[in-house]
Design a protein with these regions (language model features):
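N-terminal loops that bind phosphate or other acidic moieties
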Residues: 2-363
C-alpha cells in the first residue's frame, strides 16, 4: 500500500521535458489484434475494445493481458478562483468529499469496490490543515491562489505537484498495479480546466466552459468572463503549456499531469476520467512527447470542452452517458467494461471449438 512517507524526485521544467519514454510494444499490439481475430466472433466484433485492449497489452508488454490489480488515484485540491463566485459550492465541500473518499463512501469508492479497484485519495492541495485518516498527504499548499488576481501556482509548486503524481504511479507499479484510473475532487476545477483548455487549444472560452456542478445562467456568464479576463491578463494564447498550467491550472490538474507522465515512464495504462483528466493528459502530452500513447479514454462527459479535447488527444471514449460526477467514476466504470472484454479475449473460444469456419480479413 502507499504510505505517506513517499520521497519524490523533483525536476526542473527542462529536465521534465527531457525524460525518456520507451514506447509501447508495437509488435505486441499487432499480436493481440491477431489473437482477437482467432476468437469465434465477427472480425472486429468487439469494436473499440479490441484496439483498446491491444493498446493496454502493448503498454504492459504482454499478450496475456492481466489488469486484475487496479487503482484509481484521486487528486484533491482547492482552487483560489472560487473567490470569484464561479461555483455554487464553497471550498469546505472539497474537504467533505475527500473525507468521504478516504472512507470509500463516495461515489467512486462504491464503484471501485464493485470494480475490484484500490482507491488512492490524495490531499495535494486541500485548503485545510486537518489530518484525515485514509487520505494520502502530498499537500503542496493549502489551495491555489486566485488566478483572477495572480498566477495560481509558482513554478516550484507546479513541479512539486507533477512530481507527486509521477511518484505515486511509481509506488503503484512497485505494488503490482497493472492499470490506473484518474480521478479528482476540487471545487472550482471545471473553471481551471476550462481555462486551460481554452488556452491550450487557443479557442473561444465560451465553447469550452460549462456549468460544472450546476451553476445558473448568470454564474456561467461570470465564469466565462473570469476565464476570458485571465487569458487576456496573462496573454495565455501565446504562452507554453507549463506556463498555462502554472497560471490558471490547479494542484489537482498538475498532480494528474504527473500521473499521466508516470504511466508513460513506468508503463502502466492510464484510464482517463472526464474533462479535468483530459485537460491533464493533453498538458502532459505537450510537456513530454509520447505520453498520450499510454492513455485509455473512458467516457464523454457533459462539459463542452470534451469534444475538442478528444480530438486533440485523438481518442474516442466508449461510454456516452452524459456523466458529470467526476471523482474518477467514469474511468472506474471503464475498468468493468475492460474486464468483460478481456474475459472474451482470454477465454479464447475459437472457431474450431464451435465447428465454424474462421472469418477471413479482406480489408
Amino acid at each position: 500500500m502507499i504510505e505517506n512517507n513517499i520521497i519524490s524526485d523533483h525536476f526542473t521544467v527542462e529536465e521534465l521535458k527531457k525524460l525518456k519514454i520507451t514506447p509501447p510494444d508495437a509488435k505486441m499490439y499487432k499480436k493481440i489484434r491477431s489473437n482477437w481475430d482467432l476468437v469465434a466472433k465477427p472480425l472486429d466484433g468487439m469494436g473499440d475494445f479490441e484496439f483498446l485492449t491491444a493498446k493496454i497489452g502493448a503498454v504492459l508488454g504482454d499478450e496475456n493481458i492481466d489488469i486484475s490489480k487496479k487503482a484509481v488515484i484521486m487528486m484533491c485540491a482547492d482552487n483560489g478562483v472560487v473567490a470569484e463566485g464561479i461555483s455554487q459550492s464553497g471550498q469546505d465541500v472539497t474537504l467533505a468529499v475527500a473525507k468521504s473518499m478516504a472512507r470509500k463512501a463516495s461515489s467512486v469508492g462504491r464503484m471501485a469496490m464493485t470494480a475490484g479497484a484500490d482507491t488512492i485519495p490524495v490531499d495535494i492541495g486541500i485548503n485545510s490543515d486537518e489530518s484525515v485518516k485514509g487520505l494520502l498527504q502530498r499537500k503542496v499548499r493549502m489551495g491555489t491562489r486566485n488566478f483572477a488576481k495572480e498566477p495560481a501556482m509558482t513554478k516550484a509548486e507546479t513541479l512539486e505537484a507533477i512530481s507527486a503524481g509521477i511518484d505515486i504511479v511509481r509506488v503503484c507499479k512497485a505494488d503490482g498495479c497493472r492499470i490506473i484510473a484518474t480521478g479528482e475532487m476540487g471545487i472550482g476545477n471545471t473553471t481551471t480546466s476550462a481555462a486551460m483548455a481554452a488556452a491550450m487549444l487557443r479557442c473561444d472560452v465560451a465553447t469550452v466552459t460549462g456549468r460544472g456542478a450546476g451553476i445558473n445562467d448568470s454564474g456561467l456568464e461570470r465564469k466565462i468572463r473570469v476565464i476570458e479576463s485571465a487569458i487576456e491578463k496573462y496573454d495565455l494564447y501565446n504562452k507554453d503549456t507549463f506556463e498555462i498550467l502554472m497560471t490558471v491550472g490547479g494542484l489537482d490538474i498538475a498532480g494528474l499531469v504527473g500521473v499521466c507522465i508516470g504511466g508513460a515512464l513506468y508503463h502502466i495504462p492510464v484510464v482517463l476520467d472526464g474533462v479535468i483528466s483530459m485537460v491533464s493528459a493533453l498538458a502532459a502530452g505537450r510537456l513530454l512527447s509520447g505520453v498520450t500513447d499510454f492513455i485509455i479514454p473512458s467516457h464523454e462527459g457533459r462539459e463542452p470542452a470534451v469534444a475538442l479535447l478528444c480530438e486533440a488527444l485523438s481518442v474516442r471514449p466508449v461510454i456516452r452517458a452524459s456523466l458529470a460526477l467526476g471523482e474518477g467514476t467514469g474511468a472506474v466504470m471503464m475498468f468493468a467494461l475492460l474486464d468483460m472484454a478481456l474475459s472474451v479475449y482470454k477465454g479464447r473460444t475459437t472457431f474450431d471449438d464451435i465447428s465454424v469456419s474462421q472469418y477471413e480479413r479482406y480489408v
